[in-house]
């Protein structure tokens, strides 16, 4: 089986071209390939597939084998793959995901895609739709008791569920301990991604992320979008800002007119191989 390893802001996935390869059990394959000691090593597996209603379709699986709705960093790399490998010459394409249809704008340099802008759609703020078990309509800057401590949470879905927590210094956090506890809290019936955000200015923030099913990763595109939305709602960031993650920077904009969130970032090839 041939594969391509790519990353967006350090968020690395194994990509399988399902125009050429047949995958019978992607859940099991994701676990095997993602193992950083016994496999290839990645945050998960992405299948690039034909679509009946869009330019292309993607399915993605976390490193624990669970299927995820969307990944902002992964979808940029899908855009890179289909252009670089000659499946399209268009610079504006659509990709079908479990979180809906996403629109991509591709930016070539020397006939290779280096940067991609994604229309991530409107954020979901209603607690029942995220989903979050909560007595109010929305969960915005609410103090929640956990077994070890209290945290102030804002819940946002960008096709997959996130809670955003504002902290003084992301570098000082025990992200694994805190993230794991919040991810599995019963108020989140589908578990939750946890985004820790340190505000640097109205136009810049740092972030670390604990992803459900994968643990801490170098970056999370939907998480960065959720962080921007939560920051705007709480008066901490401008609608257009940079989010710096462990693996690199993402440029975000929450358009006031359409309410859509746009994310721009890198898409990079790591290597190609057979497994």
From Swiss-Prot:
Which PROSITE patterns does its entry note?
A: DAP_EPIMERASE
Listed under GO cellular component are: cytosol
Protein name (database record)? Diaminopimelate epimerase
- Keywords in alphabetical order, please: Amino-acid biosynthesis, Cytoplasm, Isomerase, Lysine biosynthesis
What residues does substrate bind to?
11, 62, 72-73, 160, 193, 211-212, 221-222
Q: What is its EC number?
A: 5.1.1.7
Instruction: List, in alphabetical order, the Gene Ontology terms for molecular function in this entry.
Output: diaminopimelate epimerase activity
How is this protein organized at the quaternary level?
Homodimer.
- What does this gene product do? Catalyzes the stereoinversion of LL-2,6-diaminopimelate (L,L-DAP) to meso-diaminopimelate (meso-DAP), a precursor of L-lysine and an essential component of the bacterial peptidoglycan.
Q: What's an example GO BP annotation here? A: lysine biosynthetic process via diaminopimelate
- Family, similarity comment: Belongs to the diaminopimelate epimerase family.
Lineage, top ranks:
Bacteria, Pseudomonadati, Bacteroidota, Bacteroidia, Bacteroidales
């Amino acid at each position: 089986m041939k594969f391509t390893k790519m990353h967006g802001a350090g968020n690395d996935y194994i990509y399988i071209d399902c125009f050429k390869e047949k995958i019978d059990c992607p859940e099991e394959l994701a676990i095997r390939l993602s193992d950083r000691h016994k496999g290839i090593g990645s945050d998960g597996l992405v299948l690039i597939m034909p679509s009946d209603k869009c330019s292309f379709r993607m399915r993605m699986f976390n490193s624990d084998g669970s299927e995820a709705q969307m990944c902002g960093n992964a979808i940029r790399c899908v855009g890179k793959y289909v252009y670089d490998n000659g499946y399209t010459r268009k610079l504006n394409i659509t990709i079908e995901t479990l979180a809906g249809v996403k629109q991509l704008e591709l930016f070539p340099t020397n006939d290779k895609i280096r940067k991609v802008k994604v229309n991530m759609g409107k954020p979901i703020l209603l607690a029942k739709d995220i989903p979050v078990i909560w007595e109010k309509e929305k969960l915005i800057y609410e103090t929640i008791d956990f077994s070890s401590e209290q945290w102030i949470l804002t819940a946002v879905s960008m096709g997959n569920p996130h809670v955003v927590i504002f902290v003084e210094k992301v570098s000082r956090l025990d992200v694994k301990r805190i993230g794991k506890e919040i991810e599995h809290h019963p108020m989140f019936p589908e578990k939750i991604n946890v985004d820790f955000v340190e505000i640097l200015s109205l136009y810049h923030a740092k972030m670390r992320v604990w992803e459900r099913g994968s643990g801490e990763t170098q970056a999370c595109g939907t998480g960065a979008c959720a962080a921007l939305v939560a920051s705007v709602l709480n008066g901490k960031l401008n609608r257009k800002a940079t989010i710096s993650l462990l693996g690199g920077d993402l440029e975000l904009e929450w358009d006031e007119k359409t309410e859509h969130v746009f994310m721009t970032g890198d898409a990079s090839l790591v290597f190609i191989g057979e497994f």
